[in-house]
């Protein structure tokens, strides 16, 4: 990767949604830079209000001390949450902002948070966003904001598959990669599971995470989905790696979970919103999923049919997907985009 005279040798990342900051820092450090990630402080869990208040004050003071020390060594700050502005604004200085979802998609429209989000977005030297659906929420405030496609770890180690351990089976299965919530298209996923269970041989299991809305979780189980606990990264990735096919969320975008399936060359059935997956960025064109922009996100029947087709297609005839992830969603690709954004902003 080309290097300029200064070239952002030291950058401090605040927050780490979807491990984006960790993957960016790892890629940067492999080039000889010295980037660091400082997770944002979390509110302590305690049984009573007094303990929570004391714990919050102590943790806040501890975190701010670490933040200040880290900033002295790395004055350039890449902030991964607009909501965090009141807690870090006192020391930010000139910063880059990276938006990952809820803050710009939802919070900006809530009166209690609109001003906070506006200040964070408009005062940043450069603004990045992680998924194409966020663009429409940013264009009025920062039309020049840059898409940095979600990076995916391409070197995730092998791990124990907890589904195989729980089910005491090494048989074939279809994995629903997303949590069971309406915002992820949970109702359509349940209906697709029903269609699949009615058509699949009983030797092929349906597997999903015990994560999401309780009513949808119950419905998924009734549809024949074996639910396994929410998993740490390597185990979750192993469940994806061992799947015969994966069904993604039906919200019209690819999040980290869907991209991890593509990184493992596992067939992914997912609808993509054509308003978002356009020609505005190379990563949004010819996405190698089953369905894509031609698939109606409410069409559970077609989702099931595509899943069956993927299962019946020999591996040698499936489109390779890992190479596409390497090209557009690798940590190196994300780092290249971020550095270009820094330079374009004169940061």
Stretches found by the model and what they are:
Residues 65-72, 109-127:
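Membrane-proximal helix-turn-helix segments that form the acceptor-binding/catalytic region
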Residues 76-78, 90-107, 127-128:
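Active-site proximal beta-strand in glycosyltransferases
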Residues 79-84, 251:
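Short His-centered aromatic/hydrophobic patch
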Residues 118, 122-161:
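Donor nucleotide-sugar binding/catalytic pocket of nucleotide-sugar-dependent glycosyltransferases
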Residues 159-184, 190-197, 207:
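Conserved donor-binding/catalytic core segment of Leloir-type glycosyltransferases
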Residues 215-234, 242-245:
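Nucleotide-activated donor-binding/catalytic signature segment of Leloir-type glycosyltransferases, i.e.
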Residues 241-253, 266-267:
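Acidic donor-binding loop of glycosyltransferase active sites
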Residues 294-302, 311-343:
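A charged, aromatic-enriched C-terminal amphipathic alpha-helix characteristic of glycosyltransferases
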């Amino acid at each position: 990767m080309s290097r300029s005279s200064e070239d952002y040798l030291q950058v401090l990342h605040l927050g780490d949604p979807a491990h984006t900051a960790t993957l960016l820092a790892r890629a940067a450090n492999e080039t000889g830079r010295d980037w660091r990630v400082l997770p944002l402080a979390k509110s302590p869990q305690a049984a009573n209000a007094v303990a929570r208040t004391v714990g919050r004050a102590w943790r806040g003071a501890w975190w701010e001390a670490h933040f200040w020390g880290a900033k002295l060594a790395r004055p350039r700050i890449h902030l991964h949450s607009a909501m965090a502005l009141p807690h870090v604004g006192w020391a930010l200085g000139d910063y880059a902002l990276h938006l990952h979802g809820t803050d710009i998609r939802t919070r900006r429209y809530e009166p209690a948070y609109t001003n906070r989000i506006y200040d964070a977005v408009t005062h940043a030297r450069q603004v990045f966003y992680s998924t194409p659906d966020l663009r429409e929420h940013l264009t009025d405030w920062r039309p020049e904001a840059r898409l940095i496609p979600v990076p995916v770890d391409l070197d995730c180690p092998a791990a124990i598959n907890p589904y195989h351990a729980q089910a005491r089976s090494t048989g074939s299965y279809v994995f629903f990669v997303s949590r069971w919530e309406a915002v992820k298209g949970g109702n359509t996923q349940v209906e697709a599971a029903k269609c699949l269970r009615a058509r699949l041989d009983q030797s092929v299991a349906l597997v999903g995470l015990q994560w999401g809305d309780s009513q949808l979780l119950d419905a998924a189980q009734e549809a024949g989905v074996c639910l396994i606990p929410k998993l740490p990264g390597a185990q979750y990735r192993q469940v994806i790696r061992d799947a015969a096919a994966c069904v993604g969320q039906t919200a019209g975008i690819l999040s980290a979970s869907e991209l991890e399936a593509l990184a493992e060359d596992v067939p992914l059935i997912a609808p993509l919103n054509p308003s978002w997956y356009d020609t505005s960025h190379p990563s949004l064109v010819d996405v190698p999923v089953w369905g894509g922009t031609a698939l109606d996100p409410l069409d559970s029947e077609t989702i099931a049919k595509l899943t069956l087709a993927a299962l019946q297609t020999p591996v040698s005839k499936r489109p390779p997907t890992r190479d596409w992830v390497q090209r557009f969603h690798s940590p190196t690709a994300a780092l290249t985009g971020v550095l270009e954004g820094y330079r374009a902003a004169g940061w």
